[in-house]
A protein has these predicted regions:
Chain B
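Membrane-embedded beta-barrel scaffold of Gram-negative outer-membrane proteins
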Residues: 224, 321-337, 382-383, 446, ...
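Gram-negative outer-membrane beta-barrel transporters
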Residues: 414-421, 513-516, 534-616, 658, ...
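Periplasmic-side early beta-strands and strand-to-turn transitions of outer-membrane beta-barrels
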Residues: 175, 196-198, 218-303, 519
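Conserved C-terminal beta-signal and adjacent last beta-strands/turns
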Residues: 218, 270-272, 455, 579-684
């Protein structure tokens, strides 16, 4: 009861904040100087910056967009003026640089995993002022990830997670989402590479599916063949966290592309007032679902198509917010 | 990874500028080439060192088209899957024994007394030679069907049971996919990927007449994973004396010579070149002394096998789930033998070589369709002077060449979600019989969820072995029947109706089949040659097969197989095909896991009496004889525990628990009595 009440309050709160934001953005001068700081010029980063520029240019705002790359960046490049300014730090290196040497303007971090953002913000004491050092995470909220498991494999509610021993913080919040979706979470920890297969085999004995986590100590290209093959032999499908996983043999994945995050960022920017009071760190608003029908067929799993799974997840996420 | 040095960044403060990045165009061409090559091999990171790279990186395509198995209700053929657990639970000692669990499979222990003391594994009986030459056998796509007599010498295969991931047995002809000799069925053995067999494992077995030691090491180094398995096996085979002989004559009181020592060494290495390409390398060796022969007939004074193979398999995952695969292998099967026969001491050496290259492309030509097509070339060279010395020749020297070219294709079209069509075929050209086409048409209809009907019609062939071809040349020589037409492939037209159903935790697989065999080869019988046709045999085989898999509880699994049917044949020239399919055969396996420590299984087999051809010399039978029905019971009990923190397992396995004495295939081939062995296994 109490939870529901709190959720209701949050719901109301977010609406109030949203409408307030809207009215503010209309009444005050909006942010119109946007600096994008890319960690590097890899395709994902440039996809983000070009998409953001495109979306902003389509909007009514008369913002200027400046794109910098970390390797060539000097703090003099940035304006000393905090008003009407926002810096979008793309990727962990850019975020770390901005956390270490804070610029005058507010920093919105993107393409960063949630636990990395929290770690860096804490490390450099930037977690005190989330409205000036915020993020749109790269990862998906638990209810969306577990919602995909639920929607794809109804009735198979034992979900296995394989973790390295230093990554327990990745799991923050999962139990709550699991409880809401009636999913039972089983966790196994592999301390080193030799422990990987034994831990995985233990996990497979009591799991109906596995969820890959952005834990590079486990989910790296050298381990993925072992994980995918071993789970496939046991007829236990794997859920990934990127489109590449689905191509590799995962059953499905929900993820946000850099372009989708750019869309979200553009909407955030358009909603900002001139003091660039950033919204709290949040998960990406837009996402895609990919499925591997060859794998589902091979495992004789009946599964809805990508479009209807995406629809289901959208309504699920909206309901939860 | 940065291969392109970043130049300075030119970013004007233009309004809404699209980011323009001036990258290192000034890099030298050579550096560019190196970078390109390097990036081709290591398309590692699209993203940099940031922790977000895990969301952006390419991931190696692991479950590519050829690694994914087709669910049995979508396959155009009937398939029995034997997984690792089944192999373990069966308590099988020899690879050939596992096939007793396949409905319709006839297995006779160590039946061949002449070339190698190996088991006969024949789908749907109709065994006219001990080397079950009417079935194709592949290990990781590599054909191990031997050129000399056809069929497979099971103990000569460089493989250890524990390295097998699964076995897919295609029940019925499948020349459309696997070419000639996939005539009555196909056995597809798939070994475990090295990524699944990491670490050190040691296993030892001791039992009556049997000893074995296996050591396996699986390692990984970056994108390379590999496995090395070494084993030594001592097998005393059958008892020397027959306990319940059919005759008082000495000849019928003794089993064949079948002691063997098997040294195995296997290497498999898989290298992930980049996220799309993988290279697999395999090497295998199987060697050691092997006895053959029978008392007062041909037997080996000394005989040793030396076999090895090398295989390279490149796979590239394509967009949209497609795949390109190129596989090349080389096999050498060598026998060094000194034989004793009526002529005194003979040289029984033989060398069988095979070179094979296959290219296969899988892609989706249009929506809801998948096309697999490709081609292969093969060259076999057979040297076996003693065995090819047919008729009065004691030896026929020479390396006999055999060329094979294939072109194949199969289109799988999902016309509706509940309707899958498979249309395919193989065009094949070989040195002996020229060009053949073997088509197949199949439709799988998912009548409702969990219930599928399959109707298929296919044609298949078996090409003559080198031995048969040599006989063909012999009979067609000037001194015999110069007008005798050249020998052709054996043919079969096969029609079947299958049902695959799911009732809760029970899986049902039932099929009715009607196989029309023609041009069946018989060369050893002078009547066939005199009659002007070495391909005179015909037979109609009709029957049914049932397979049940039931997960009775979380801990108990039951697998049952039943098959039955009959063969109608004119038995031309006295070659017996009638009744060569047992009227029925069953197998039942019950396995139960008591707790984390204890588990066990019971396996029962029953085969009805079966008629065989002339290889038996029982004086009371003329051409063709019956082997009585038999029953066999096997059991296994395992205890798993930790030894110094490592997983260990102790098992006791008893084959032929009831100590039944009966014959398989021949009346001088009495199955060993109760054979108990202890197995200890440690994952180090």
């Amino acid at each position: 009861m109490r939870w529901q009440f709190v959720r209701y309050l949050r719901y109301v709160g977010s609406w109030v904040a949203f409408s307030l934001g809207l009215s503010l953005s209309q009444s005050c001068l909006a942010v119109d100087n946007i600096t994008i700081l890319l960690s590097e010029d890899g395709p994902a980063y440039t996809e983000f910056s070009s998409q953001l520029s495109t979306v902003l240019s389509q909007g009514n705002s008369k913002s200027t967009v400046k794109v910098l790359i970390l390797s060539a960046y000097k703090s003099e490049d940035l304006s000393r003026n905090a008003n009407n300014q926002v810096l979008i730090a793309v990727g962990t290196p850019a975020m770390t640089a901005m956390a270490q040497k804070p610029p005058a303007m507010a920093v919105l971090n993107v393409l960063v995993p949630r636990h990395t953002f929290q770690k860096i913000a804490k490390q450099f004491g930037r977690n005190q002022d989330p409205h000036h050092f915020s993020a749109i995470y790269f990862d998906q909220p638990w209810n969306r990830q577990l919602g995909l498991v639920r929607a794809t494999l109804p009735g198979r509610n034992r979900l296995g997670l394989l973790l390295s021993k230093d990554s327990a913080e990745i799991l923050t919040g999962i139990q709550l989402a699991a409880k809401e979706l009636d999913i039972q979470i089983n966790v196994e920890t592999a301390t080193d590479d030799s422990e990987l297969l034994p831990a995985l085999r233990r996990l497979l004995t009591n799991s109906d599916s596995l969820l890959a986590l952005p834990d590079a100590a486990i989910y790296n290209r050298n381990n993925i063949p072992s994980i995918l093959l071993t789970s496939y032999r046991q007829k236990v499908p794997l859920f990934g966290f990127s489109a590449a996983y689905v191509k590799a043999g995962a059953l499905a994945a929900v993820y946000s592309s850099p372009g989708q995050i750019a869309q979200h960022v553009a909407e955030v920017i358009q909603g900002l007032s001139s003091n660039a009071y950033l919204p709290l760190p949040q998960y990406p608003r837009y996402f895609s679902v990919n499925t591997n029908t060859q794998v589902s067929r091979s495992l004789s799993l009946e599964m809805e198509d990508e479009a209807s799974l995406t629809r289901k997840l959208k309504s699920l996420t909206e309901r939860a917010q | 990874m940065h291969f392109l040095a970043l130049g300075h960044i030119l970013l004007a403060e233009k309004k809404h500028s699209i980011p323009y990045i001036h990258s290192g165009i000034h890099l030298s061409r050579r550096a560019g080439c190196v970078a390109l090559l390097f990036s081709l091999l290591h398309q590692a990171a699209l993203a940099g060192d940031g922790e977000e790279s895990i969301f952006l990186d390419d991931v190696p395509v692991v479950l590519s088209a050829s690694r994914l198995s087709q669910p049995i209700n979508e396959a155009p053929v009937a398939v029995t899957i034997i997984d690792r657990q089944m192999i373990k639970d069966s308590g099988a000692w020899d690879l050939s024994e596992i096939f007793r669990l396949v409905p319709g499979m006839y297995v006779a222990y160590h039946a061949d007394p002449y070339f190698s003391a190996d088991s006969t594994v024949a789908y749907h009986g109709m065994v006219t030679t001990t080397t079950s030459d009417r079935m194709q056998v592949l290990i990781d796509g590599r054909s191990v069907y031997a050129s000399l007599f056809g069929g497979v010498n099971w103990s000569d295969l460089p493989i250890v049971l524990d390295d097998i991931e699964r076995i897919e047995v295609i029940r019925g002809p499948d020349s459309a996919s696997y070419g000639a000799n996939s005539y009555s069925g196909v056995i597809n053995i798939i070994t475990r990927h090295p990524a699944e067999t990491q670490g050190k494992t040691m296993s030892m077995a001791f039992g009556k007449g049997r000893k074995e030691g296996i050591f396996r090491y699986g390692g990984k180094s970056g994108a390379l994973s590999y496995r090395l398995t070494a084993s030594i096996r001592e097998d005393q085979g059958e008892d020397d004396r027959i306990k319940r002989p059919t005759s008082v004559f000495t000849f019928w009181n003794l089993n064949k010579y079948d002691n063997k020592t098997i040294h195995n060494l296997n290497l498999r290495a898989d290298y992930q070149l980049n996220s799309a390409d993988t290279m697999e390398f395999q090497f295998g060796y199987n060697g050691g002394p092997r006895e053959v022969g029978e008392y007062n007939n041909v037997s080996a004074i000394s005989r040793r096998a030396e076999n090895h193979f090398e295989m390279l398999h490149w796979r590239r995952a394509l967009e949209g789930g497609g795949e390109l695969s190129v596989q090349a292998f080389h096999t050498v099967e060598r026998v060094y033998a000194r034989l004793k026969d009526s002529d005194g001491i003979s040289d029984g050496d033989a060398i069988l070589r095979r070179y094979d290259l296959e290219v296969q492309h899988t892609f989706s030509p249009f929506a809801n369709a998948r096309l697999v097509w490709g081609g292969s070339i093969r060259y076999d060279q057979t040297y076996a002077p003693y065995y090819l010395g047919v008729g009065d020749n004691q030896y026929l020297y020479g390396d006999f060449p055999y060329h094979l070219r294939r072109f194949f294709g199969n289109l799988e079209w999902r016309a509706r979600p509940d309707l899958v069509f498979n249309v395919g075929g193989m065009i094949e050209n070989n040195t002996y019989t020229g060009t053949d086409t073997t088509p197949r048409f199949a439709v799988n209809w998912h009548v409702q969820h969990g219930h599928t009907l399959r109707l298929s019609h296919s044609r298949a062939t078996r090409s003559p072995s080198v031995y048969e071809k040599t006989y063909d040349s012999y009979w067609r020589s000037a001194e015999f029947y110069p007008g005798l037409p050249e020998m052709q492939t054996e043919r079969v037209k096969s029609t079947e109706l299958g049902y695959i159903g799911k009732y809760g935790k029970l899986d049902v697989d039932f099929r009715l089949f009607y196989d029309d065999y023609s041009q069946l080869i018989d060369v050893r019988n002078k009547r066939s040659a005199a009659g002007g046709n070495l391909n005179a045999g015909t037979a109609i085989m009709r029957g049914y097969e049932l397979q049940l898999k039931a997960q009775l509880t979380d801990k108990t699994r039951l697998i049952y197989g039943l098959s039955g049917g009959g063969v109608k044949s004119d038995n031309v020239n006295g070659v017996v095909y009638s009744d060569s399919l047992p009227k029925y055969s069953h197998s039942l396996m019950l396995s139960h896991r008591v707790n984390d420590q204890w588990s066990g299984s019971l396996v029962a087999y029953q085969v009805a009496r079966t008629k065989f051809n002339s290889t038996d010399y029982n004086p009371r039978e003329n051409r063709g004889y019956f082997i009585d029905s038999n029953r066999r019971l096997d059991g296994k009990l395992s205890y798993q525990f930790k030894l110094g923190g490592k997983a260990a397992e102790c098992s006791v396995i008893a084959q032929n628990l009831a100590d039944a004495r009966y014959f398989e295939y021949r009346h001088d081939n009495e199955l060993p009595g109760r054979a108990v062995r202890l197995n200890f296994r440690l994952d180090m």
